[in-house]
Amino acid sequence: MKVVYGHTDSIYVQIDSVEKAQGAIEHINNEVRKKFPNVLGLEEHPVVLEFEKFYSSLGVGITKNRNAGLVSWQDGVWLDEPKFAMTGFSAKKISETKFAKGIQQEVLKMWVEQKTFDEINSHLQKKYNDALSGNVEFESLIKRRRFNIEKFMLKCPCKKQMSAFKLSNGDDLIQGLYCSKCGKPRTSFTTREGKKPTYSEGNAAIMFSIQNGLLREDIDSYVFLKVEPVGFYTHPITGKKIEGHYVARRTYDDLREYTPNYAHYAEQVLKKAKPVYDAMGWDTLKIKNKKQTLEEWF
């Protein structure tokens, strides 16, 4: 057997058949029992190697904990048809966009189905060009998040606390970039957990929208989108004007008045394909570069 991947309490090996795997499992468990007897007399030996899945095809990424494959046998049962399974990829994240999830799932499935580079790259080129031209489902580009006002509470070293929104919406603290209680600069402010405040993506979207009167602070959730620049918001720590590239609203329909940054979403195609391309030694820039045939030139 050849070990192809291992992580914490699991190991993946290359083996010809389920029968051979079952035989190997039995042999290994017997050897473990010989070397380490069950001296406590437990009903089951404390160390047991279990056979969970047999993949008809498996792809392993170069980053730890990433793999994808087609499972044909699981927990003692042959499946009616191979089941696609993946571990460690962002397509499983709830916070990811439907568009990005779809791209990664598609490229992973093509990979484990052993499609050629040309087949995979051609498919992704179309997805890239569709995104760049805006030929994508609008809702698939949107992210949804819960709104927690606590995440926007800031703390000065002197223990005074204030809302990041108050610092940029007329509160007396906006009069200077210092704490009104102790005089320390706002750059020394942290979150309640003691971390440095950051305003990117969803946080930037909510900051822009609340400051510009598009949302209130009493909401429980919001949706947001990366858009072409639409205005400015004030950074609560530095006091600088920041160009708004993300917008948050209550519903999908509220966002339709904005133009998505399609170049950004097109780049997501390359980003989501990267784990597979890295594993295969391919260049993701090939997704952008469409080769032309002689017929296309003339």
Segments and roles (model prediction):
Residues 1-8, 13-298:
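DNA-dependent DNA polymerase catalytic subunits
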